Amino acid sequence: MSNAMTSKLERFIDQGVGRVPADIVLKGGCFFDLVTGELVQSDIAIGADRIVGTSGNYEGETEIDISGRIVVPGFIDTHLHIESSLVTPHEFDRCVLPYGVTTAICDPHEIANVLGAAGIEFFLESALETIMDIRVQLSSCVPATHLETSGADLPIESLLPYRHHPKVIGLAEFMNFPGVIHKDPICMAKLDAFQGGHIDGHAPLLSGNDLNGYLAAGIRTEHECTTASEALEKIRKGVHILVREGSVSKDLAALMPIITERLSPFLALCTDDRNPLDIAEQGHLDHMIRTAIASRVEPLAIYRAASISAARAFGLKDRGLVAPGWRADLVVLDSLENCRADMVFSAGRRVTDALFSSRRPVAPIGLDSVKARPVNAAHFGVPVAEGETPVIGVIPGKIITEHRRYRLPVRGNEAAVDLANDIIKVAVIERHGKNGNHANGFVQGFGLKKGAIASTVGHDSHNICVVGVSEDDMARAANRLSEIKGGFVVVEDGKVTGEIALPIAGLMSLEPYETVRDTLHQLRKAAFALGATLEEPFLQLAFLPLPVIPHLKISDRGMVDVDKFALIG
């Protein structure tokens, strides 16, 4: 051990014993003991980045009065894609840390699907600069499947150089569960390389012996549970369940029956995909905690899931409790029930605007990633099918879709939209400059009566996805995305009525999160003016091309029957 470390430890010991003042002391409040469930009236002494004393009286070089307030451990978001916040990691840090999220475990597979290893390096470089502790899971499935065209390919050889990076935890969500079960050689190589480390799961609706086989590969965490029964089967088989509540995937209500003190050691919280507008209006993990307690979940259960249980699930042994020797990631709350952060400490540093200003900026990348071919109305024709036509059925608040079938109206020799049944056109256009693929189909559930909306955010390969009533408007929206280098676009009667540019890989803005938030307000209004009924139409649109989530999706290669893991002929 170095002399510097010995000296540092000696100072921690002296501060804990009370021989010398702590760096910071929080006085007059209490803390929530997540071991016993007690509210403990106590000073909290901080030395550098760790807690050095509790359950006593301390003097500090800086003393902060928190009378009447409660201190809890910093919250840990155990699975998210920062790209879905539509801002850079630096702006995500500034946006979310004040809500008490002191650790975020991200999978940068959105940017990796567009830019490959360069996208992962951008996140790792950013994570070294943020105030929040951003940890990175290495994207396991780039591309997610062979049923779509992505911008990059990340074989195991591309991941191994990052395996021991200080910000890397392990292998990110293994979405290709059929590949695991059927022992696909590419999947096997990645799983083998990360045995003994953390491997994150992604196995919606998988059960029985197939689930056993999937877990036998060493997968330990999973965030795709949408029912309590699904979660219980996985918990019984040793899986740590990450309860999800994002901007589209809202599973908290369905999973509340399992959020109990008994099961809380095997639970954690995550957002997966959450945009700045929802964060500004509702919050982040604090929103999940408030919602759960309002629905009579025991505070001890949900606060454990938000911190200590989450830390243990991912091997972060230094955080998750308000106790001596633990990392000083702390949130000062008005009450456990309201869960409003009055003050946040990240590694012993009080979170302020000045602290964010001290970060080194990281240069943006991928500013010319949208290489789609121009389209016109004729590109969106769908030939009349014999019998019924497959239609993607959108379920509000879910990324799972239904495989529906309808006899559609005919216009000329083409199938047409059916507004009476809320069925409109959907198309995916390859935008990485590889093959110019273009696939068309139908979707039900957006509520559009006119116009079109389009996006370069299209999980997971992030091709252009557009839905609409008018083929002319669909073409205008798709072409406009190329002009602004990616983003979201709303078109009505040939005119762009709303847009946001996302030029970093076609996924993230160069603007501050406040600007993105305000622009999203206007964008939603433009979508609602077309008749959109979904609470989050753009993120819901972004999941239509995701062929690893049941049941019917669309990629640039065509309609995908996810249950059969095959294109529909």
Swiss-Prot record:
One of its GO terms (molecular function) is adenine deaminase activity. Its cofactor is Mn(2+). Keywords: Hydrolase, Manganese. It catalyses: adenine + H2O + H(+) = hypoxanthine + NH4(+). The keyword Hydrolase applies. InterPro entries: Adenine_deam (IPR006679), Adenine_deam_C (IPR026912), Amidohydro-rel (IPR006680), Metal-dep_hydrolase_composite (IPR011059), Metal_Hydrolase (IPR032466). Pfam families: Adenine_deam_C, Amidohydro_1. One of its GO terms (biological process) is adenine catabolic process. Its EC number is 3.5.4.2. Belongs to the metallo-dependent hydrolases superfamily. Adenine deaminase family. This is Adenine deaminase 1.
